Amino acid sequence: MARITVEDCQERVDNRFLLVQMAIKRVHQYREGYEPLVESRNKEVVTALREIAAGKVLPDDDALYTPPAEQAAAVNEG
């Protein structure tokens, strides 16, 4: 599987500090029993970053989220 980078995640969430908070929150959720939203055999933090990059995990404030291009086009059309 390809490597995940902060830049991949910043396509969805601009703020690096928010990105770190989201990843930490997601890791805590895994430890509470939540299931990952993407298939991954990586460590928890890498799985959390993969979820963020895939747009599966959103910040609490939707204004801070940049949807994938195809999703944004569908919203603008509808």
Curated annotation (Swiss-Prot):
Pfam families associated with the record: RNA_pol_Rpb6
A Gene Ontology cellular-component term: DNA-directed RNA polymerase complex
Classification via SUPFAM superfamilies: RPB6/omega subunit-like (SSF63562)
GO terms under biological process: DNA-templated transcription
The EC number(s) this enzyme carries: 2.7.7.6
Disulfide bonds: none
Entry keywords, A to Z: DNA-directed RNA polymerase, Nucleotidyltransferase, Transcription, Transferase
InterPro entries assigned to the protein according to its UniProt record, in alphabetical order: DNA-dir_RNA_pol_omega (IPR003716), Pol_omega/Rpo6/RPB6 (IPR006110), RPB6/omega-like_sf (IPR036161)
Entry annotated with the keyword Transcription: yes
Source domain of life: Bacteria
One GO molecular-function entry: DNA-directed RNA polymerase activity
Catalytic activity: RNA(n) + a ribonucleoside 5'-triphosphate = RNA(n+1) + diphosphate
NCBIfam families in the cross-refs: rpoZ
Function: Promotes RNA polymerase assembly. Latches the N- and C-terminal regions of the beta' subunit thereby facilitating its interaction with the beta and alpha subunits.
Family affiliation: Belongs to the RNA polymerase subunit omega family.
Family annotation (HAMAP family): RNApol_bact_RpoZ
Known partners and oligomeric status: The RNAP catalytic core consists of 2 alpha, 1 beta, 1 beta' and 1 omega subunit. When a sigma factor is associated with the core the holoenzyme is formed, which can initiate transcription.
Name assigned to this protein: DNA-directed RNA polymerase subunit omega
Organism: Desulfovibrio desulfuricans (strain ATCC 27774 / DSM 6949 / MB)
